[in-house]
Amino acid sequence: MFDDLSNYRPANPALWQGRKDTANQERFFQKITFIDNQNELMTKDKKTIFLGFASDTGIKRNLGRTGAKLGPDQIKTQLAKLPCHNNKHYVDLGNVVCENDELELSQSQFAQIVHFCHENGHQICAFGGGHEIAWAHYQGLSSLYPKLGVINFDAHFDLRPYKKGEFGNSGTPFSQIATYCEEKKMPFHYCCIGVQKFGNTPSLFEKAKKLNVSYLSAEDLYEQSQAWQIAFLDDFILNLDHIYLTICLDVLAECYAPGVSAPQALGLSPWQIMPLLKYLIQSGKVVSLDIAELSPPLDSELKTARLAALIIAELLDTN
């Protein structure tokens, strides 16, 4: 399957284990299926596809703390154990792995799989890996969804300087998307939720302003009402047909998410972002989703991994 993609690795069924103390099909490990041939995805039976992007090369290039390459498998391991409260069909399609600093190749191959799955009517729920997953994920969606907006829950804009032909990193994905949109003469629709004042330099705030980025700071989520926040999201998504939703776990406070490259002492709580995430899913406009920056070697008692899995489970159960 995907034999022409050198960095693709098939799913590992051993990751999907859990308690068997209740009726069949009540936990994710009992719901997951695997396929042997990509032609099995060319059917009318639409599925949610789990796809990992096992890379921390972008984090390394960004001078961060590595370990996120192990994130996808750990998220799958934790998700497997959780109860599943819906009747959706899930497929673990495996991972795209970044080897030997070949980030650009890995991103291209990840994008090809995303494109193939969406072209055949499936939805992607992807697990990073560093936030370099965002540029890979977007490339797989852009030609299929012309009026596509990006909503990023993140402490950082990830708009660090990037010029075409340079190597990107975990801090440049949305600069890369902006450059791509400019080249294609497409509007750049980008919204960032949970921005930390001291996680971004003044020049990054200036760049966000120049690119007309919509954003809410972490303070906005503490100080403003949920109704105000939802009105902000409504204004952003009003003229968009589709949304690519990406979650960087460092948007959350270090006490909840210690296992990330750049933990945030003044980050948000899970229940400050969950209502907004669920609202976006309920809008019907989210076509693809990922969660990034889990670094198992930096985690404490699986706190971040378990939280990542719970966030995914909550969103998969939201209609």
Swiss-Prot record:
Q: Which GO terms describe its molecular function?
A: agmatinase activity; formimidoylglutamase activity; manganese ion binding
* Enzyme Commission code: 3.5.3.8
Q: What class of enzyme is it?
A: hydrolase
Q: Which domain of life is it from?
A: Bacteria
Question: Could you say which residues bind Mn(2+) 1 here?
Answer: H131, D154, D158, C248
Which residues of this UniProt protein bind Mn(2+) 2? D154, H156, C248, D250
**PROSITE patterns linked:** ARGINASE_2 (PS51409)
Question: Reaction(s) catalyzed by this protein?
Answer: N-formimidoyl-L-glutamate + H2O = formamide + L-glutamate
| Co-factor requirement | Mn(2+)
Instruction: List the transmembrane segments.
Output: none
The note on cofactor binding and number reads: Binds 2 manganese ions per subunit.
Gene3D superfamilies cross-referenced by the UniProt entry: Ureohydrolase domain
GO biological process terms on file: L-histidine catabolic process to glutamate and formamide; L-histidine catabolic process to glutamate and formate; putrescine biosynthetic process from arginine, via agmatine
> Which pathway does the UniProt entry assign to this protein?
Amino-acid degradation; L-histidine degradation into L-glutamate; L-glutamate from N-formimidoyl-L-glutamate (hydrolase route): step 1/1
**Alphabetical UniProt keywords:** Histidine metabolism, Hydrolase, Manganese, Metal-binding
By sequence similarity, the record places it as follows: Belongs to the arginase family.
Name the job this protein performs.
Catalyzes the conversion of N-formimidoyl-L-glutamate to L-glutamate and formamide.
Q: Which NCBIfam families match?
A: hutG
Can you name this protein? Formimidoylglutamase
**Species this chain originates from:** Legionella pneumophila subsp. pneumophila (strain Philadelphia 1 / ATCC 33152 / DSM 7513)
Q: What is the lineage of its organism?
A: Bacteria, Pseudomonadati, Pseudomonadota, Gammaproteobacteria, Legionellales
Q: Which gene encodes it?
A: hutG
